[in-house]
Amino acid sequence: MDFPSRFEVIVIGGGHAGTEAALASARMGAKTLLLTHNVETLGAMSCNPAIGGIGKSHLVKEIDALGGAMAMATDKGGIQFRVLNSRKGPAVRATRAQADRILYKAAVREILENQPNLWIFQQAADDLIVEQDQVRGVVTQMGLRFFAESVVLTTGTFLGGLIHIGMQNYSGGRAGDPPSIALAQRLRELPLRVGRLKTGTPPRIDGRSVDFSVMTEQPGDTPIPVMSFLGSKEQHPPQVSCWITHTNARTHEIIASNLDRSPMYSGVIEGIGPRYCPSIEDKIHRFADKESHQVFIEPEGLTTHELYPNGISTSLPFDVQLQIVQSIRGMENAHIVRPGYAIEYDYFDPRDLKYSLETKVIGGLFFAGQINGTTGYEEAGAQGLLAGANAALRAQGKDSWCPRRDEAYIGVLVDDLITLGTQEPYRMFTSRAEYRLILREDNADLRLTEKGRELGLVDDVRWAAFCKKREGIAQEEQRLKSTWVRPGTEQGDAIAQKFGTPLTHEYNLLNLLSRPEIDYAGLVEVTGQGAEDPQVAEQVEIKTKYAGYIDRQQDEIARLRASEDTKLPVDIDYSGISGLSKEIQSKLGATRPETLGQASRIPGVTPAAISLLMIHLKKRGAGRQLEQSA
């Protein structure tokens, strides 16, 4: 039967990509349906109980700046917060939170259920309704038909999911959940390039069977950081420590002697696993010279004894898993609550997507998350928000939007995926961005919230808080610029004594703050006045100290902007462009870049080829002008 009500956007999947997609679409006023096979697993953390980290927290903060849920749910569910790289520059500092799975999931569900324009329905999606290369809706497992202008697929590891533990395998989307077989078969019928990837998870341990006294304690930071720009430490539940132990020679011997029983090394698993989150057997094989590897013992929540041993993801047989765990210091008597496993699943080549994350071959069909070859909650959430927003824009007859590489890590992520594709699960790092000093986690709101407001993603509460912060920064910069200190005065002498820097002439406080040896907190201590909001103080200090570097990056961005924004015609025939080699014609034809800037980032496309493209575009433009004037 047909569902009696029509929607503008349908989102399939209730994981990190799906929830952000559905929320984004609904915030923009589109009537949105979130289809999930199980309402109880909305926002579930399928793998590690943590949000953020190097490169990843930048995505979380950008999701937050655009009104998303991930950071707010983390503040409500985070049981340990730390700032990584705190001794390094602001470009690479990253907030990481250990989360209580139950609290995090509950926070996500609360946000979903209180979002206007959003309906939730529990049914697996088995088929897409496609007419004349346009998606029209979805057919569920029981034959119920839903219709909409846009459909967002966020299927995670469920498409053709196959779980491996040793030589045994069985179909599953994740442990305890069925796979999506019918939808996977339907998608394989579409003219899209498909492949297989693999990810894995470690065995879970009962904390009552672990000896923490021989491990190294890793407490959270004090003062406790927050993840959301609207967050506060008062939202946080009680905080706990993580613990560190190590594998050893005995552990490595057990693994090495059982590699023939590993589905990875016996050819059973075809999918490629994540390079930057390898299984323990992969680590032992690839880094045979290392005597030990760190294992982070992470609590799964405040109301459970379950522990997540981060660093020993494995698909070895259970008897080997038990030997591995019990060979590690502090876990000699450990009880495994859930075995580790690997899961293999379908993904689709992201080069078949537009910047909006809409497929090039089926209008109105959007992909987000692991279906695009990424790994990680944060990468999924970022894509989900973008796909959901663009699905709503399409349904409303408006132009799509995607931030550029110099505007957001979301822009870096999408550009990498649709330009380069990926043959292994893609993870975000700060090193992937050319303009790291501009794309910091601390200024994500200053970069994106105004655009989010324009799109309809940002509500009144967030907008008011943002405007207050932005105004506070401007006022504090002006105060520092207009406050002067002279040598020989009480303040001048106090500054010289505090920082060991005698004043040679009159300075304003903004000039002084630009010196490497002078910090904002110290200036406030000496002068007795400063910003009350720590976010304002942080922005003023970073902007002042790194002004020269930031200006240089902005100049470089401005120079490149022209080619970045030059659109390539959808119908361009690369085989007809004189001077392009067959190889470059093939690469351009396979990727179908949307802009000249994107074309320049395709491996093997030379600067000379870009020049030829520019000449072709000029000739094409001149030719069309002549046709119009004739």
Swiss-Prot record:
GO biological process, one term: tRNA wobble uridine modification
A cellular component term, taken from the record's GO annotations: cytosol
Cited PROSITE patterns: GIDA_1, GIDA_2
Domain of life the protein comes from: Bacteria
Subcellular location as annotated: Cytoplasm
One Pfam family named in its UniProt record: GIDA_C_1st
Residues holding FAD: 13-18
Entry keyword set: Cytoplasm, FAD, Flavoprotein, NAD, tRNA processing
Entry similarity comment: Belongs to the MnmG family.
Function as written in the Swiss-Prot or TrEMBL entry: NAD-binding protein involved in the addition of a carboxymethylaminomethyl (cmnm) group at the wobble position (U34) of certain tRNAs, forming tRNA-cmnm(5)s(2)U34.
Quaternary assembly: Homodimer. Heterotetramer of two MnmE and two MnmG subunits.
Name of the protein in its database record: tRNA uridine 5-carboxymethylaminomethyl modification enzyme MnmG
